[in-house]
Amino acid sequence: MMFRLTSVSCFLLVIACLNLFQVVLTSRCFPPGIYCTPYLPCCWGICCDTCRNVCHLRIGKRATFQE
């Protein structure tokens, strides 16, 4: 009975450690100049394809209506 209790305790401890490592590894952030997404955030600044302090608007040609 003692062996079974110890194995269950070790198993639960391993699961708890894996959950802790998952939180630590997935909560990282990226410095300026590195590619980012909403799921891979910047440490500071704004995500505009790469981590930047300010996003610049991309101004291009507007579509024209053709008849």
Swiss-Prot record:
GO terms for cellular component: extracellular region. InterPro entries: Conotoxin-I_CS, Conotoxin_I2. It is found in: Secreted. Expressed by the venom duct. Residues 63-67 form a propeptide. It comes from the Eukaryota. Keywords: Amidation, Cleavage on pair of basic residues, Disulfide bond, Ion channel impairing toxin, Neurotoxin, Potassium channel impairing toxin, Secreted, Signal, Toxin, Voltage-gated potassium channel impairing toxin. Residues 1-26 form the signal peptide. Disulfide bonds join C29-C43, C36-C48, C42-C51, C47-C55. GO terms for molecular function: potassium channel regulator activity; toxin activity. The keyword Disulfide bond applies. The modification Isoleucine amide is found at I59. Pfam families: Conotoxin_I2. Inhibits the vertebrate voltage-gated potassium channels Kv1.1/KCNA1 and Kv1.3/KCNA3. The cysteine framework is XI (C-C-CC-CC-C-C). Belongs to the conotoxin I2 superfamily. This is Kappa-conotoxin-like 1. It comes from Conus vexillum (Flag cone).
